[in-house]
Structures are given as structure tokens and as C-alpha cells.
Design a protein with these regions (language model features):
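Ordered hydrophobic segments in well-structured contexts
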Residues: 7-13, 27-33, 76-78, 95-100
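Short, low-complexity interaction segments enriched in Ser/Thr/Pro/Gly
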Residues: 2-3, 33, 85-87
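GIY-YIG-like beta-to-alpha core
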Residues: 28-40, 44
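Short, mixed-charge low-complexity intrinsically disordered segments
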Residues: 44-104
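A residue-level detector for conformationally permissive "hinge/kink" positions
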Residues: 22, 38, 63-66
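N-terminal cationic leader/targeting segments used for protein routing and processing
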Residues: 3-7, 20, 37, 91, ...
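Short aromatic-glycine-(Arg/Gly/Cys) micro-motifs in beta-strand/loop hairpins
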Residues: 2-28, 45
């Protein structure tokens, strides 16, 4: 799957470092710091009702743990996580992971 063919929404579960994520993912449709913000922002970004309904059902930590444990990627949860550290960022933990959802 080519990056320019997918539609991605990233939900940051702890810290909203918008600039970092926007630079890293060129195909990002929206970056939201919570599911509630994702639904509100998704409407503003023109996502379809079915995509918004999908976002509304997400339990971020459950989906993240399940997808990581199953080693899945693709339709339901394309999950990526950062283990990098720098002056601004703590090492990745369950409270600092984020999700990238392919909504196509």
C-alpha cells in the first residue's frame, strides 16, 4: 500500500506534538489528541460518516494493545510507535504511544 493512496488519522493518546507528527507523516489527514477531538476534527476535515463512526468506536489503548499483540496492520489499525528519545520526549510507554488508522 503506497502512502499517497491512503487516508490516515493519527490519534495521540498522551501528548499532542502536532509538528512532529505532521512532518513525519506526509499523508496525515488530521492529528487529534483524543477520540472526542478526532470526531470533531474529522467532520471539519470532510471525512465520511462511516469513517467518523469508526473513530467514535475506538478505545485507543485497547486497540493499540490488541493490534500490537496480534502484529496487525492495515484495515483496522495501522499501528506505529516511537521508541526514540530526545530533549522533549520521554521513552515510549503505553501512555505515550500513538495510533495511525488507515480509514480507506
Amino acid at each position: 500500500m503506497k502512502a499517497n493512496k491512503k487516508q490516515t488519522v493519527i490519534i495521540v493518546t498522551a501528548y499532542g506534538e502536532d509538528n512532529y507528527f505532521q512532518k513525519r507523516y506526509e499523508d496525515v489527514v488530521g492529528i487529534y489528541t483524543s477520540v472526542k477531538n478526532a470526531i470533531k476534527g474529522a467532520k471539519a476535515d470532510g471525512l465520511t460518516n462511516s469513517q467518523i463512526d469508526y473513530l467514535n468506536r475506538i478505545n485507543a489503548f485497547y486497540m493499540l494493545d490488541k493490534a500490537l499483540n496480534e502484529g496487525r496492520s492495515g484495515e483496522s489499525a495501522q499501528v506505529e510507535y516511537e521508541e526514540e528519545t530526545d530533549a522533549r520526549r520521554k521513552p515510549c510507554t503505553s501512555s505515550y504511544m500513538f495510533q495511525s488508522y488507515n480509514l480507506n
